[in-house]
């Protein structure tokens, strides 16, 4: 699936988050208690994709998926020499 807009990316992220939460058999209420994020915020996020970054970090951590957040802007190893050359031109 090619994501074209920030809104589409946010909705797709919310969908994947909901699937992860469900796979771990964690209810929104239990996640709210564990994370300190209000139930209404979780419900809004899963429905619209809208959430503050800090709340997303808290939810992700409560699900034991801290590495997902840590990997967001991690240094990435270039896949090819062309990528290295392009990067040096910027």
Task: Set out the residue ranges of the language-model regions.
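Short alpha-helical DNA-recognition segment
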Residues: 25-43
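A short, Lys/Arg-rich alpha-helix, primarily the initiator
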Residues: 1-23, 72
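Short, basic-rich loop-to-helix N-cap that marks the start of a DNA-contacting helix
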Residues: 48-61
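Short, charged recognition helix plus adjacent turn
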Residues: 70-90
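Short basic helix-loop element that most often maps to the first helix and adjoining turn
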Residues: 15-31, 88-90
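Short acidic/histidine-centered micro-motifs embedded in hydrophobic/aromatic stretches
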Residues: 34, 59, 72-76
